[in-house]
């Protein structure tokens, strides 16, 4: 397992905005938004920091995950990215004034298809991203959902890969301000009062951050794109035509390892999935909650042999 790597919140990675020497773009490297990004050279401090941060949050899946590229979104090259960076700094200062000098800036992962991430980098977040969680019974409010930087696996699991199995994930700087706890399944879409600025799943140990639509392009600044491959993840949540283990086979394997109560929880969710009441990523999330990542990892790895 990758060693735990901590990205200092607030200003640590902020100070890396001077740029990096870059590698030539390889033929299979995802290409994002032209001049808005640069490809970071492997083994440099900045590349390793982001790579290790991602892998340290992948748990058992880290050893079966390959980083393809790490790209940096430049804040000073284009007029649009300059403007977004200026807006983010402006709202950071405003949040400090509101909350006694503390803006509470964090780092969070956001997953999506290459096309979605490219669109977010170019134009910002929109209602298309909000709609992803509107009907999700497991969401914590209706807004832009990001995952704490220590728990990248949760974001990696729901990302959509391309035909070569490459998935992409954004590391964003996020202004949380004073968050409020949002319960699972909530349809809340804005702060409950002027006292609060954002939402979290848990106040003591947050894993999910929720930024409301009214602030989504002010409180979130996309900073890095990690492109990666994992045959185990592709097998679990990839297209139905090419999984390494089908859900029906997985149900059979799990029935030999789980007690009746836990197995019934999974079978109920699986039945909802087949009736199209649940999306694939929602079923995967339920399986993770009930089974645990370690057992799931062992099952998927054994099926690859």
UniProtKB/Swiss-Prot annotation:
Residues 23-249 form the PARP catalytic domain. Induction: By salt stress. Residues 238-305 form the RST domain. Coiled coil: none annotated. InterPro entries: Poly(ADP-ribose)pol_cat_dom, RCD1/SRO1-5, RST. It is found in: Nucleus. Keywords: Developmental protein, Nucleus, Stress response. Its main location: nucleus. The keyword Nucleus applies. GO terms for cellular component: nucleus. GO terms for molecular function: NAD+ poly-ADP-ribosyltransferase activity. Probable inactive ADP-ribosyltransferase that may be involved in stress and developmental responses. Interacts with STO. This is Probable inactive poly [ADP-ribose] polymerase SRO3. The gene is SRO3.
């Amino acid at each position: 397992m990758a060693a735990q790597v901590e990205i200092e919140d607030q200003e640590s990675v902020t100070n890396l905005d001077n740029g990096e020497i870059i590698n030539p773009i390889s033929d299979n490297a995802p290409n994002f938004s032209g001049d808005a990004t640069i490809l970071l050279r492997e083994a440099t401090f900045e590349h390793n920091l982001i790579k290790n941060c991602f892998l340290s949050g992948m748990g058992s899946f880290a050893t079966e995950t390959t980083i393809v590229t790490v790209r940096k979104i430049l804040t000073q090259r284009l007029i649009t990215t300059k403007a977004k960076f200026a807006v983010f700094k402006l709202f950071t200062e405003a949040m400090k004034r509101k909350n006694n000098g503390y803006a509470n800036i964090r780092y969070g992962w956001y997953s999506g298809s290459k096309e979605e991430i490219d669109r977010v980098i170019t134009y910002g977040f929109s209602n298309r991203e909000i709609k992803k969680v509107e009907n999700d019974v497991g969401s914590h409010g209706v807004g832009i959902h990001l995952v704490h930087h220590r728990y990248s696996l949760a974001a990696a699991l729901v990302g959509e890969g391309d035909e070569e199995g490459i998935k992409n994930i954004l590391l964003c700087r996020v202004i949380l301000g004073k968050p409020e706890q949002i319960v699972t399944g909530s349809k809340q879409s804005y702060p409950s009062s002027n006292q609060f600025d954002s939402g979290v799943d848990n106040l003591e140990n947050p894993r999910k951050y929720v930024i409301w639509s009214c602030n989504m392009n002010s409180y979130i600044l996309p900073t890095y794109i990690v492109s990666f491959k994992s045959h185990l993840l592709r097998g679990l949540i990839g297209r139905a035509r090419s999984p390494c283990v089908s859900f029906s086979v997985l149900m059979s394997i799990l029935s030999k390892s789980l007690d009746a109560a836990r197995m019934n929880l999974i079978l109920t969710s699986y039945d909802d999935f087949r009736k199209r009441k649940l999306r694939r990523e929602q079923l995967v999330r339920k399986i993770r909650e009930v089974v645990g990542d370690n057992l799931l990892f062992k099952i998927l790895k054994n099926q690859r042999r």
